[in-house]
Amino acid sequence: MAKKKKKVDENNQVLATNRKARHDYQILDTWEAGVVLLGTEIKSLREGKASLVDAFAVIDNGEVWLHNLHIPTYSMGSWTNHSPKRTRKLLLHRREIDSLMGKVRDGNRTLVPLKLYLVNGRVKLELGLAQGKQDYDKRQDIKRRTEEREVTRELGRRIKGINA
């Protein structure tokens, strides 16, 4: 009897990640926020087309807004299609917004989207409180990662040498 293929859960999947944010910023804390979207935006996201590269969040009048999230127009859409880089509202609890306002106002910090994903059919955004890294910090991180990689590689070689 043939094996059954595992069904991909379309209601719980990662739609886009912002890998550059973890490289350019030190992430101090994260929050999960809902995103207010139009119907054609949801359909376009389900096609796997989104970019968080230049996106950032701003707190304005006690509301959190996401700028520069690029969701291309829906391929099967008509005149009802959305604008690809429109400003989108993020849904957070009032005390979370107040906490964010205090932390961003302290200075030298910004709100950066890290991941866009589906939870039970609803689009959620992982929002990070970020502080910019200097060039030497980035170089130190790269050096540390390469050293860790070399150590694990050497351990693997030694284990294979003993067991083989």
Swiss-Prot record:
Localisation per UniProt entry: Cytoplasm
Keywords: Cytoplasm, RNA-binding
Major localisation: cytoplasm
SUPFAM superfamilies, alphabetized: Small protein B (SmpB) (SSF74982)
Database matches in InterPro entries: SmpB, SsrA-bd_prot, SsrA-bd_prot_CS
GO biological process: trans-translation
GO cellular component: a single term: cytosol
CDD domains: SmpB
Disulphide-bonded residues: none
Entry keyword annotation includes Cytoplasm: yes
An example molecular function term from Gene Ontology annotations: RNA binding
Keyword Transmembrane helix: no
Source organism superkingdom: Bacteria
Classification via Pfam families: SmpB
Family of the protein in this entry: Belongs to the SmpB family.
Function: Required for rescue of stalled ribosomes mediated by trans-translation. Binds to transfer-messenger RNA (tmRNA), required for stable association of tmRNA with ribosomes. tmRNA and SmpB together mimic tRNA shape, replacing the anticodon stem-loop with SmpB. tmRNA is encoded by the ssrA gene; the 2 termini fold to resemble tRNA(Ala) and it encodes a 'tag peptide', a short internal open reading frame. During trans-translation Ala-aminoacylated tmRNA acts like a tRNA, entering the A-site of stalled ribosomes, displacing the stalled mRNA.
Protein's UniProt name: SsrA-binding protein
